[in-house]
Every structure is written in structure tokens, then in C-alpha cells.
């Protein structure tokens, strides 16, 4: 029951965060007339654009816009994003941590570390 409440609360908070940064994120991930292609946003995220990184995290968390829901990848992108933009990305990390096991968080942190160590080239 508690997990269900946290999950519902997480979705509400995430929705608020996404609306708050929606224009900035869409502008960052839009290469051609607000394209929602995952490859466009991924390319920007790998170039270090924190808005695109947050967008990748949100896409993986919600399983929308061309990706399957994957909280580990969502956490990885939020962690990478938090290196440059702690506010919103840090809140995203807090939301994800409420829904993830310690093992999943450890895996996601390791993936983020490898991604950052490769200058954002090996982010899978």
C-alpha cells in the first residue's frame, strides 16, 4: 500500500516537474520542428545538454516517446543531468529512489559513472 502511495505521489510530482521545464526541454530536444525522435534527444543529451538529459530520464521513467519504461536508465540520465543542473534533476533522482531497490540504484549509479567516464559516449 505504501509503495502504491509513493508511486502515485511520484507521478504527480514528476508531472509537475515535467510541466515546469517542458518548454525548455522540448526546445532542447527539438532538432526539426519539435521532433520527438529519441535519437535527436539522445544526441543532445550525449553532447552534455542537461535539459535533454532530464528529458531522457523522464522518457525512461514514463516509457514514452520511443522508449520502454526503465527506471535504471531513468536514474542514470537523472544522475548525469544532476552534475550540471542539480535542482530539477536532483528532484527526479529523489522520485526515482522512492520507486527503486538499492540494487537497482547501485546499478544505475555504476552506469552513470561509466557514462560520465566515457565523456557521455557509452551511455546505455
What is each of the regions a protein language model found here?
Residues 1-10:
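Bacterial N-terminal signal peptides that target proteins for export
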Residues 31-39, 68-76, 107:
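Structural signature of tandem alpha-helical TPR/SEL1-like repeats
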Amino acid at each position: 500500500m505504501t509503495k502504491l502511495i509513493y508511486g502515485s505521489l511520484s507521478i504527480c510530482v514528476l508531472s509537475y516537474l515535467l510541466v515546469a521545464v517542458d518548454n525548455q526541454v522540448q526546445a532542447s530536444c527539438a532538432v526539426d520542428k519539435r521532433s520527438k525522435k529519441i535519437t535527436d534527444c539522445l544526441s543532445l543529451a550525449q553532447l552534455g545538454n542537461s535539459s535533454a538529459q532530464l528529458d531522457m530520464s523522464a522518457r525512461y521513467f514514463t516509457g514514452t516517446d520511443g522508449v520502454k519504461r526503465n527506471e535504471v536508465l531513468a536514474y542514470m540520465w537523472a544522475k548525469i543531468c544532476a552534475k550540471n543542473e542539480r535542482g530539477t534533476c536532483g528532484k527526479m533522482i529523489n522520485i526515482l529512489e522512492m520507486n527503486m531497490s538499492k540494487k537497482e540504484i547501485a546499478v544505475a549509479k555504476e552506469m552513470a559513472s561509466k557514462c560520465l567516464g566515457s565523456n557521455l559516449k557509452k551511455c546505455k
